[in-house]
Amino acid sequence: LFPSESNQYPYPQSLTGTIFTRSLITGSKYRHNLKDSALTTGNNSYIYYNDKGLPIQTRKPYMEGSSGRQTIITNQYSFSGKLLQQVVYHGKSYTTLTNKYSYDHNGRLIQQTSKAKDQPEKIISENTYNTLGQLKSKNLGDGLELQTYEYTIRGWLASVNGDYVA
């Protein structure tokens, strides 16, 4: 009846993994030599997927040669498969970075925010679109930079920040 993009299910999908990962990369192992010794160590990386084949979690070594330290990236998606939230956790430094993404009714990115540890949430970018769905302006940071986009009558990108040149 309705395309999946118009189904704006308000709640994110659960982080349920799947065992049906045929033709998907689920892990890797690589070896590297340490500079100060003749010993060779190896590191493993793992990727977990949901039932739609989207990566819900990635685990990889925090640094080369660091034993037990991992970077864990966890993704949460909407019903239509758009990335809603990404949480990045870095090893033993206990650094957590949370990125959130907001979309309009057509599935276009309208806002991206980021939060580090106990800091307040900051706006990374805000996008506005014209009536044809083309990117009209992009506000980066909390008003640090505003990029404006202009298009030709055919819909081709004519200029970015054209006012600065004139």
Predicted regions and their residues:
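Beta-strand elements of repeat-based all-beta scaffolds
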Residues: L1-A166
